[in-house]
């Protein structure tokens, strides 16, 4: 029987974000800048990562508490060896209705078919520019946008449902909004533009670098005829619109200008096995990995997860001001540990 639990602000638990690795083959400035994550950076050793059996056990217990959706994140999750084994395990859990994966897309041709065969049907590909030169300057690994576009074409050809995520930074890639909308509209692929967020400690975020949803919408309406789309479910993070001529949808994620804390239903497990109730968490998370490895039963694990959720009161984006950003900037968990 599924228990219905809510946090201190009355929010149910519906989603679990599982970070499977802290490693990535890109060095995007807003997530893992090369100046910090250089060639000598020490990533987590394998024994510090949760095993797939541990992740599946955690997911099963969370399903009994109301989780219906699981998203696999990183780092770059396709760098975790044998990820299809985890997908297959998660697909066998009663109550889990949807498994998604967020990736930079570079390794889709290498691993996509195995993941599809294991039961993965839905992926989000992070792609912050369609211009090759600009994209290379963003990822700092000399990877061309055309390379990722080819990987996306491959993913759709094997049956994966693909959405594209774009983090927009003022003066960096805001000129990519219109060409990317045009490209993916013609491909009938949903694209979502995300306001630049102050996740982690190393991305140099401030308000002046944010292109708000209203600014994006004004730009878009000068080039396309669109209609708004009603939200599909409680907790949907994107504001969706539909192109009038062919019905393809796109989304704007208002993580800064119009926060969605009040409907956030996500629990997050970092790559080092810690629970966090918020993407912008500052305190050190509860060490689920150590708790599991201490020999607890599933019932004890469930009671701990219940307690963690019931004391949750995170609403950082609701409270974000220049001062709170300054006060918390050096204390947040980095994005490569917790995913997006």
Curated annotation (Swiss-Prot):
Catalyzed reactions: GTP + AH2 + S-adenosyl-L-methionine = (8S)-3',8-cyclo-7,8-dihydroguanosine 5'-triphosphate + 5'-deoxyadenosine + L-methionine + A + H(+)
UniProt cross-references to Gene3D superfamilies, sorted A to Z: Aldolase class I
Gene Ontology molecular functions: 4 iron, 4 sulfur cluster binding; cyclic pyranopterin monophosphate synthase activity; GTP 3',8'-cyclase activity; GTP binding; metal ion binding; S-adenosyl-L-methionine binding
Record-level GO BP terms: Mo-molybdopterin cofactor biosynthetic process
Positions of GTP binding: 17, 71, 102, 163, 266-268
Binding site for [4Fe-4S] cluster 1: 24, 28, 31
Key words, A-Z: 4Fe-4S, GTP-binding, Iron, Iron-sulfur, Lyase, Metal-binding, Molybdenum cofactor biosynthesis, Nucleotide-binding, S-adenosyl-L-methionine
Pfam family, one: Mob_synth_C
Pathway info: Cofactor biosynthesis; molybdopterin biosynthesis
EC number(s) from the headed UniProt entry: 4.1.99.22
Cross-referenced PROSITE patterns: MOAA_NIFB_PQQE, RADICAL_SAM
Family designation: Belongs to the radical SAM superfamily. MoaA family.
Function: Catalyzes the cyclization of GTP to (8S)-3',8-cyclo-7,8-dihydroguanosine 5'-triphosphate.
Protein name: GTP 3',8-cyclase
Gene: moaA
